[in-house]
């Protein structure tokens, strides 16, 4: 098999002419493989057995973690832009990246909150892909549900189930990203945690355990439609890419360049569409309790202004109204540049590695 091709458990829908009829499984000669053959052709798996669910779980966890790691610094820039829209030095994506790098460094600046992100990255991605694949197979094979509805529903359900794992890490990550380095002399975020452990202890002690799920509804309002759209787009783009490759005389599996392109387009498009809810989610999860609004958080520079917007609430509708009243329509697209880059590149990395790991596991643990 050409090293530029990948096997996949993600379906590519073939036309009836993609696979020539065989003498096995005809109406006159039924056999036990007929049902499986029909399902494989509907799903477009190139007549290869579908990967076991545990392959999808492991592959998804690896792809998600590496993708998140690679793009964390850009996610930090997006968080600063959304959490501090009034700070001029963070308004431009490139200059914001450079400013954070020069002022705060890589580890505590651009990669602030990295350990918090990794706390939920692998398990949540593993749960998502396992749920997504199981739901998709059940809906298509057992219930004969329309493909587009299936992909939207599977992405929606996968993200909902994994949210119980990633939301607490998202709260901690976002606050640490907004804070930057400890005793930050360059930006007063409203938080000053010395490390991840201190952040967990402080949040639970001062705000209660439930605060780790603060903004849960806002997070779901962003992530459920994002995942549903991302994978519906991804499945459709892969089908189109496969048809194009078929016209060029290639059949069976999608080439790596097209795997990268389809993943990037799916993630980037879904990212742009869901940016308004990403803004609300960031504001909700990083707002300060009223009792701490006048508290100085920078020991070395206690009078540095934070440029933070007014506190919102846990209400999505009120948060949307507050953003609109204070910043207008453009406020809903604060950080859209880095979010587009992040979601497109992260999606391409994650989904490419997902496919590659699936192939490796299939070779190491064949199902035949």
UniProtKB/Swiss-Prot annotation:
One BP annotation, GO: magnesium ion export from mitochondrion
Region of interest (Disordered), residue spans: 1-48
Membrane topology listed for this record: Multi-pass membrane protein
UniProt main location, coarse: mitochondrion
Solcar repeat windows: 51-138, 146-240, 254-360
Cellular localisation: Mitochondrion inner membrane
Key words of the record: Membrane, Mitochondrion, Mitochondrion inner membrane, Repeat, Transmembrane, Transmembrane helix, Transport
Note: Present with 2060 molecules/cell in log phase SD medium.
Protein name as it appears in the record: Mitochondrial magnesium exporter 1
Organism of origin: Saccharomyces cerevisiae (strain ATCC 204508 / S288c)
Originating gene: MME1
């Amino acid at each position: 098999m050409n090293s530029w091709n990948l096997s996949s458990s993600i379906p590519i829908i073939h036309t009836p002419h993609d696979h020539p009829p065989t003498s096995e499984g005809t109406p006159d000669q039924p056999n036990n493989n007929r049902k499986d053959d029909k399902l494989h052709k509907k799903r477009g798996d190139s007549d290869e057995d579908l990967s076991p669910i545990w392959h999808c779980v492991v592959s998804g966890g690896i792809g998600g973690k590496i993708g998140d790691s690679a793009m964390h610094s850009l996610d930090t820039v997006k968080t600063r832009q959304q959490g501090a829209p009034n700070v001029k030095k963070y308004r431009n994506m490139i200059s914001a990246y450079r400013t954070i790098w020069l002022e705060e460094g890589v580890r505590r600046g651009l990669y602030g909150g990295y350990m918090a992100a990794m706390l939920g990255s692998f398990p949540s991605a593993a749960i998502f892909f396992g749920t997504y694949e199981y739901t998709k197979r059940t809906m298509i094979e057992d219930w004969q549900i329309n493909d587009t509805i299936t992909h939207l529903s599977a992405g929606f359900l996968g993200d909902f189930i994994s949210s119980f794992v990633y939301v607490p890490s998202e709260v901690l990550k976002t606050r640490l990203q907004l804070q930057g380095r400890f005793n930050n002399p360059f930006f007063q975020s409203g938080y000053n945690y010395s490390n991840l452990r201190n952040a967990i202890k402080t949040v639970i002690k001062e705000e209660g355990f439930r605060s780790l799920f603060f903004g849960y509804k806002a997070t779901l309002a962003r992530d459920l439609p994002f995942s549903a759209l991302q994978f519906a787009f991804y499945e459709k783009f892969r089908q189109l890419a496969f048809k194009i490759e078929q016209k060029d005389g290639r059949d069976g599996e999608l080439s790596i360049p097209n795997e990268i392109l389809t993943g990037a387009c799916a993630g980037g498009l879904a990212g742009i569409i869901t940016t308004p809810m990403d803004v609300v989610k960031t504001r909700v999860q990083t707002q300060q309790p009223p009792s701490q609004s006048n508290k100085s958080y920078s020991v070395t520079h206690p009078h540095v202004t934070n440029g933070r917007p007014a506190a919102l609430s846990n209400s999505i509708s009120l948060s949307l109204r507050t953003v609109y009243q204070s910043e207008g329509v453009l406020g809903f697209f604060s950080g859209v540049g880095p979010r587009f880059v992040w979601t497109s590149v992260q999606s391409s990395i994650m989904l490419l590695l997902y496919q590659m790991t699936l192939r490796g596991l299939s070779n190491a643990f064949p199902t035949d």
